[in-house]
Amino acid sequence: MRILSVTAQKPCSTGSGVYLTEVVKALAKEGHTQTVLAGIARGEQMDMPDGVKAYPVYFESEGLPYPVVGMSDEMPYISTRYKDMTEEMTVQFRNAFLAVLDEVIEREDPELILCHHLYYLTALVRERYPEKKVYGFCHNTDLRQMKTVSYT
């Protein structure tokens, strides 16, 4: 099976990133074709297991000129909290991730999409590709962050 794993955060840098990487490794051992789409800082690389295709979305770049988004108030790297994003930042995020997502879907044609965190990117993936099987992983930090947002 062709499987795409998606996260807006750096893989391997946080608990959810380590979880994503371990799921990718386990599924690769089962013979599945793996692709990962992830947000990273410009100038960084995605270190994925052998045979796994990596599609980075670069933060701190012209199209996405702020640090990688994070699901916790304090991340192990410089980050942007979702609740601090402006409307302009949200549009930049959407455009940058959908451009790479469209490329991945066209090139890799995943049969299954695994999205990490029940937040904005998972919603974008589901909305853009309603015909695809999309599963969302909740790592609990997303629920905690939702409680801190003012909905007035």
Segments predicted by a language model, with ranges:
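N-terminal subdomain of nucleotide-sugar transferases
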Residues: M1-Y58, E108
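Active-site proximal beta-strand in glycosyltransferases
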Residues: L112-C115, V125-Q145
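Conserved small/polar residues in nucleotide/adenosyl-binding loops
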Residues: T152
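Short, flexible loop segments at the rims of nucleotide/cofactor-binding pockets, characterized by
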Residues: C12-S13, E88-F93, L143-V149
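Short N-terminal targeting/anchoring amphipathic segment
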Residues: L101-Y119
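A conserved catalytic-core segment of Leloir-type glycosyltransferases
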Residues: G39-R107
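Short, well-ordered alpha-helical microsegments
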Residues: G43-Q45, Y120-L124
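Short amphipathic alpha-helical segments
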Residues: M48-P49, V125-E127, V149
